[in-house]
């Protein structure tokens, strides 16, 4: 359980104002110049020592990612913050953007300094109108007070931060598709290599980080890497904002330690499963793109490694709870439709496969299929997984794989009830 004094996002519910003065009372922008004066190597080393792993889903070491940037680049360097939060069941970054914008802006300044970038872009989801408005007001305040811009915080470092609104494409949450969109092109993922650290925005060295990953950096530097590393579990350190939605009594966002038991999160903060824990059917633990877990596995600890051992993943930390009233086959079919709709169409396995999977899933929903089609569907998901430029193909395949792994009997019963053997 996270102690009150260890919380990083103290205004996650918007109970206080998000303006500069209120944010400073909560500790934001405190002696930022002193943190910058410690130098780039110190900042990167502290972030590495803290064990901070990317909070956008991949879980890659944030400090390690920063260290890939060239030290003496002839080209300008860029920091890009991925605020294109579009994963079904995920809304953690949304609350940070609207209620804790100054934490993000301060984090952008420090991260930009650490990687040698004088320009930062915050790419925000197009539908986040109010969040974009709050962010822009916060940026205007920071510029007015000299916290960012020329000679930011009196540090001698120039850093301009710009807000760029997306246009509603889920695929632009993929880092290279996001860069394409920023450049004014159609949001389609790039082949890697080259990686963004060598050839990113406008062909220049670029680091792309998630909102939460950047927003926690100032607090880590103030309190020390050892403080952050002592929270959570080895290799899964610090705090994490979890989103709990679906069939719970009180849907909410909550900051807790990495490794907190899934059942404890739901019982303590979300008022429990609707109808009690025994009424639980399944949980998607990390946003729509990770495989679901049946009730028997739902007391797992919420961290990257523990969830991997049970065949799922932490992803974004978006917990979707489904009780026994759920048509689990239709629920996953609905996700299949989402991924079919959001595929950019660049890769054949994803372009053709997502539509094919959705059509088969809808037949399974009705039971109008043959039993051998279950294995055919599973085989197709494995042909898509790992055979596309970006991870959208994997994201479309994994929910179906989880469904077949844990609820094959229910699919077969649906087919039997329809009357086709």
UniProtKB/Swiss-Prot annotation:
It comes from Rickettsia prowazekii (strain Madrid E). Its EC number is 7.1.1.-. It holds the Pfam family NADH_4Fe-4S. Its cofactor is FMN; [4Fe-4S] cluster. Belongs to the complex I 51 kDa subunit family. It catalyses: a quinone + NADH + 5 H(+)(in) = a quinol + NAD(+) + 4 H(+)(out). Keywords: 4Fe-4S, Flavoprotein, FMN, Iron, Iron-sulfur, Metal-binding, NAD, Quinone, Translocase. The keyword Iron applies. Binds 1 FMN. SMART domains: NADH_4Fe-4S (SM00928). NDH-1 shuttles electrons from NADH, via FMN and iron-sulfur (Fe-S) centers, to quinones in the respiratory chain. Couples the redox reaction to proton translocation (for every two electrons transferred, four hydrogen ions are translocated across the cytoplasmic membrane), and thus conserves the redox energy in a proton gradient. The gene is nuoF. [4Fe-4S] cluster binds at residues 344, 347, 350, 390. NAD(+) binds at residues 54-63. NCBIfam families: nuoF_fam, PRK13596.1. Gene3D superfamilies: 3.10.20.600, NADH-ubiquinone oxidoreductase 51kDa subunit, NADH-ubiquinone oxidoreductase 51kDa subunit, iron-sulphur binding domain. InterPro entries: ComplexI_51kDa_subunit, NADH-UbQ_OxRdtase_51kDa_CS, NADH-UbQ_OxRdtase_suF, Nuo51_FMN-bd, Nuo51_FMN-bd_sf, Nuop51_4Fe4S-bd, Nuop51_4Fe4S-bd_sf, SLBB_dom. This is NADH-quinone oxidoreductase subunit F. FMN binds at residues 166-213. One of its GO terms (molecular function) is NADH dehydrogenase (ubiquinone) activity. It comes from the Bacteria.
């Amino acid at each position: 359980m996270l102690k009150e004094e260890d919380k990083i996002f103290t205004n996650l519910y918007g109970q206080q104002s998000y303006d500069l003065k209120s944010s400073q009372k909560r500790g934001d922008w405190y002696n930022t110049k002193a943190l910058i004066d410690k130098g780039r190597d110190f900042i990167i080393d502290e972030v590495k020592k803290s064990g901070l792993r990317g909070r956008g889903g991949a879980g890659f070491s944030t400090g390690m990612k920063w260290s890939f940037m060239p030290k003496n680049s002839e080209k300008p360097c860029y920091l890009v913050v991925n605020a294109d939060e579009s994963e079904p069941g995920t809304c953690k970054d949304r609350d940070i953007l609207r209620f804790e914008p100054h934490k993000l802006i301060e984090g952008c300044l420090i991260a930009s300094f650490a990687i040698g970038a004088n320009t930062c872009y915050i790419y925000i989801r197009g539908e986040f109108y109010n969040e974009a408005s709050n962010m822009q007001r916060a940026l205007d305040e920071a510029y007015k007070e000299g916290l960012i811009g020329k000679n930011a915080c009196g540090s001698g470092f120039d850093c301009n931060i710009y807000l760029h609104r997306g246009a509603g494409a889920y695929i632009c949450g993929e880092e290279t598709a996001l860069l394409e969109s920023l450049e004014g092109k159609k949001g389609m993922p790039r082949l890697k290599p080259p990686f963004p650290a060598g050839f990113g925005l406008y062909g220049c060295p670029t680091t792309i980080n998630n909102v939460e990953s950047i927003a926690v950096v100032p607090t880590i530097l103030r309190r020390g890497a050892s403080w952050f590393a002592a929270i959570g579990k080895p290799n899964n350190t610090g705090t994490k904002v979890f989103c709990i939605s679906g069939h719970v009594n009180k849907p909410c966002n909550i900051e807790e330690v990495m490794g907190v038991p899934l059942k404890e999160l739901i019982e303590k903060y979300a008022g429990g499963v609707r109808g009690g824990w025994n009424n639980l059917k399944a949980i998607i633990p990390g946003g729509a793109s990770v495989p679901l877990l049946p009730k028997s596995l739902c007391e797992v600890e919420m961290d990257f490694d523990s969830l991997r051992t049970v065949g799922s993943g932490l992803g974004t930390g978006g917990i979707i709870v489904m009780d026994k009233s759920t048509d689990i086959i239709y629920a996953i079919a609905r996700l299949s439709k989402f991924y079919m709709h959001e595929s950019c169409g660049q890769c054949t396995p994803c372009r053709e496969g997502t539509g094919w999977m959705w059509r088969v899933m809808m037949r399974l929903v009705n039971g109008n299929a043959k039993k051998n089609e279950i294995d055919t569907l599973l085989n197709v998901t494995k042909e898509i997984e790992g055979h596309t430029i970006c991870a959208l193909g994997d994201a479309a395949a994994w929910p179906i794989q989880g469904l077949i792994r844990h609820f094959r009997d229910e699919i077969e019963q649906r087919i039997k009830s329809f009357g086709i053997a």
